Amino acid sequence: MKTLYKSLLAFVAWVMLSVSALAVDVIVVSHGQANDPFWSVAKNGVDKGCKDMGVSCKYTAPATFDMVEMAKLIDNAVSQKPKGIVITLPDAAALGKSVKAAIAAGIPVISMNSGSDDYASLGISAHVGQTEFEAGVGGGQKMKAAGGKKALCVNHEVGNVALDRRCAGFKKGFGGSVDILGTSNDPTEIQKAVAAKLGGGYDTILTLGAGLAGEAALKALEAAGKVGSVKLGTFDMSPGMLKAAAAGKVEFLIDQQQYLQGYLPIAIFGQYMRYGTMPAGVVMTGPGFVTPDNAAKVIKWAAQGCLLYTSPSPRDTTA
């Protein structure tokens, strides 16, 4: 009997140690998949932050842009009782209940990438990213200065409030006619949709993501022989769009530094676990602009999986 009792105690101790070893300090719930060119860079930042801070992390995301599934992932993260949760916040209305449940459970939450205008209303203390409307204003101002009169804003994630704000900011900065083209996130479909619009007198195109929409729009312009005559700019960066910028085919890429958006929340939680302190407000990682003048020096960083801040953006003091 004593032998059995000792064996049971040993088994319970082993289970407790195993659970402790499997416990996750920080869970990241993103709307972007780690195999997406943009989000793979953000995940690299998460991984490096976890290594540098000595914390265990888990990166999760729905298979597609799906707010119902993302809310379930946040709920699941809460049930695991981590020391912190990092989320993107593309739709505060859809995710608000789950975020508030995490905070009510005593789990601190940091938002990154999407959500600069909404994080505080949900009780989140800090956001890491760029202010989307202001970034759009800067892009619009650049296209206006380049002589643009009629623009197309290509939205590949319809329902993502952050992308809506990018287009709204672009429209304000541009000042001319701006139409919104809603698409799926399939590059082939985006290319076809942009190609179908090229006969509509557009002299300017802004895409809201480089790896999917930006490269697809560039292919449409190349196929139609309109590179240069139709100005193209994009949010975010990808190796293909960086090369296009270096070749003078793209007016600008708006760099929000997604590597830092992944890294900094983990670093913040690392310090929080040690000292109990956390910054408040928006920790700005962008926007910065990559242009044909500075694209070459940025390409070397892209090859290493991190895209770094390049230059300050124009500010719109009336926003």
Where do the PLM segments sit?
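Sec/Tat signal peptide C-region and signal peptidase I cleavage site
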Residues: 19-23
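Short beta-strand elements in bilobed, periplasmic/extracellular small-molecule ligand-binding domains
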Residues: 53-62, 153, 173-187
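Single conserved hydrophobic/aromatic residue that forms the stacking wall/gate
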Residues: 309-319
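Hydrophobic alpha-helical
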Residues: 75, 86-104, 170, 185-244
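Flexible loop/hinge segments that line or gate small-molecule binding clefts
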Residues: 92-134, 236-251, 299-301
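Hydrophobic alpha-helical segments within soluble ligand-binding/sensing domains
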Residues: 70, 126-151, 187-191, 237-241, ...
